[in-house]
Amino acid sequence: MSGKPAARQGDMTQYGGPIVQGSAGVRIGAPTGVACSVCPGGMTSGNPVNPLPGAKVLPGETDLALPGPLPFILSRTYSSYRTKTPAPVGVFGPGWKAPSDIRLQLRDDGLILNDNGGRSIHFEPLLPGEAVYSRSESMWLVRGGKAAQPDGHTLARLWGALPPDIRLSPHLYLATNSAQGPWWILGWSERVPGAEDVLPAPLPPYRELTGLADRFGRTLTYRREAAGDLTGEITGVTDGAGREFRLVLTTQAQRAEEARTSSLSSSDSSRPLSASAFPDTLPGTEYGPDRGIRLSAVWLMHDPAYPESLPAAPLVRYTYTEAGELLAVYDRSNTQVRAFTYDAQHPGRMV
């Protein structure tokens, strides 16, 4: 380029803050590539604020991680940076991202992988069984539909370890950034068809993260809701050790009703909470459209190693403001371990 250091969106700076401005699109399959940096050779300071776009960023915080093979790890990251084409708000509220916030868009002219860092990575269309490698992102994308990769292929052993139903399905896509794995399995969530739907229903023009698979063939599965207000949202996880987790999700209307009921029964409240103070729906913000669905708690429902010793309380619990912003995090002892404050004039902007 110009002899200056290059970086792309999502890379970490010297002082620990990730770059959140710059090109979020990388074309894979083109004869040449372009690397963008926020400010080649420039000075940066301030933690956790990125001084260039003025965005506050928090690196990943892990709320849940039990030991074992291919465990379910629940973490979250925050950035106040708002893109011009934001993805829908996730289950932690505006500005927050979870590891499962990954989607692959299927278009006539190509594939777009939206990762959990807000980037859009472009690939050429793939035939069944075809694989492509992004040198700039160090990432493989492979379409299912092939029993084995050619001998000597970088992914031959990792591909062969996948269960046959995953390897042979041309409707599944898999991504990985290492020949050692794991795979991100990109499929679609089942849903209950409506009375007006034509059957069989066509597959959606996108794929969502439905699970992980490691080089030993073990899988982690995300279960998504098939009907109702939570359609498409993750409500259950089974990890590589066979443990089953239940993710309790709430809607904005449910949280508003609970808050109003609590205010009526509280001796500290002189008047009931009004609908305007805690609305039943959330307007769209600069962070994207918002269905108002939030993760409330995570329960361990089954553990093959300790079937009779399940915890009587959730492993982690979350509370939210009336604007749907993540307010506090509580551990399994119901101790508050994190709390957050936001700008009242700008929903989702942490202060």
Give a label for each model feature:
Residues 56-61, 97-99, 105-109:
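Short alpha-helical segments and helix-capping/turn motifs at coil-helix boundaries
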Residues 76-77, 98-101, 133:
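N-terminal targeting and processing segments
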Residues 30-83:
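Intrinsically disordered, low-complexity segments enriched in small residues
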Residues 1-49, 306, 313-318, 337:
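Intrinsically disordered, low-complexity proline/glycine-rich segments
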Residues 92-94, 109-351:
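Extended charged/polar low-complexity repeat regions
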Residues 83-97:
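Short, polar loop/linker segments at the starts of domains and inter-domain junctions
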Residues 60-62, 100-101, 315, 327:
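Generic recognition of flexible, low-complexity loop/linker segments
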